[in-house]
Amino acid sequence: GKPICGETCFKGKCYTPGCTCSYPVCKKN
């Protein structure tokens, strides 16, 4: 399945591949 970008981003970094930080959560790149 595709990664879900819903984690909170810390210092502009997202742990899920293909996601970017749109504070305060990660969004699909």
Curated annotation (Swiss-Prot):
Keywords: Disulfide bond, Plant defense. GO terms for biological process: defense response. The keyword ATP-binding does not apply. The keyword Disulfide bond applies. Coiled coil: none annotated. Disulfide bonds join 5-19, 9-21, 14-26. It comes from the Eukaryota. Pfam families: Cyclotide (PF03784). This is a cyclic peptide. There is a cross-link at residues 1-29 (Cyclopeptide (Gly-Asn)). Belongs to the cyclotide family. The presence of a 'disulfide through disulfide knot' structurally defines this protein as a knottin. Probably participates in a plant defense mechanism. This is Cyclotide mden-C.
